[in-house]
């Protein structure tokens, strides 16, 4: 008997369709929404890139590298053919103190800045049992200056039995467009950090707050749910860079990504 392919993401889409409340939202689009859901992905079972539609891995990888640069301008993304942040950028390409700035340069009261990512790597090497291996993008003082408040706001690393796991808290979860990117992005980051600190990959745990499907995505979601999934692809590294900040797109080797065609949908801005 063939073992069914797990479909936690697609199962959550069905949950939102069946149980979601109708809510208004900042964009004026309207959503079906549930509150407080969790998905778990064992990274030993493959790389969690959704197969029931094509997900653009290049954009995911370059966005993560852009975060790790501590960048707040879309110029570097555009140079590499990635346009996913263009809708929020100003005429100079600026977004304000968004994810990368908070990850790499969190402002301290004394005028210095904290590199949260470097702290994560250092703590994993020095004290892997710490319960404080955390990165936050939710800087309350800076939110008014951000083009978009952080949706994926807070993540924590955890080490047990020689394996590195990561849990993300996503306060606002656009299930059709955003969440497939977020799952793959943080799974990739977990694999990168695990390689850097000499641990095996464990789980990626995704926790969502306001988990929603936009009203203008319902048709696309139903089309996606009519498709049978393929087995998860694999992700390996072409080399081991000197640090977590030295990875290049060419270092990520995605193998065996079978997928259904892409499904187009409008972004709620």
Swiss-Prot record:
Q: Which Pfam families match?
A: Thymidylat_synt (PF00303)
Q: List the active-site residues.
A: 151 (nucleophile)
Tell me which residues bind (6R)-5,10-methylene-5,6,7,8-tetrahydrofolate. 56, 174, 268
**Location of the protein in the cell:** Cytoplasm
Which residues hold dUMP? 26, 131-132, 171-174, 182, 212-214
State the SUPFAM superfamilies in the record.
Thymidylate synthase/dCMP hydroxymethylase
Primary location: cytoplasm
Query: What EC designation does it have?
Result: 2.1.1.45
Q: What is the reaction catalyzed?
A: dUMP + (6R)-5,10-methylene-5,6,7,8-tetrahydrofolate = 7,8-dihydrofolate + dTMP
Select a single GO molecular function from the record's annotations and give it: thymidylate synthase activity
Annotated pathway: Pyrimidine metabolism; dTTP biosynthesis
A cellular component term from Gene Ontology for this protein is: cytosol
UniProt enzyme class: transferase
Tell me how this protein assembles: Homodimer.
Q: Describe the function of this protein.
A: Catalyzes the reductive methylation of 2'-deoxyuridine-5'-monophosphate (dUMP) to 2'-deoxythymidine-5'-monophosphate (dTMP) while utilizing 5,10-methylenetetrahydrofolate (mTHF) as the methyl donor and reductant in the reaction, yielding dihydrofolate (DHF) as a by-product. This enzymatic reaction provides an intracellular de novo source of dTMP, an essential precursor for DNA biosynthesis.
Name under which the protein is recorded:
Thymidylate synthase
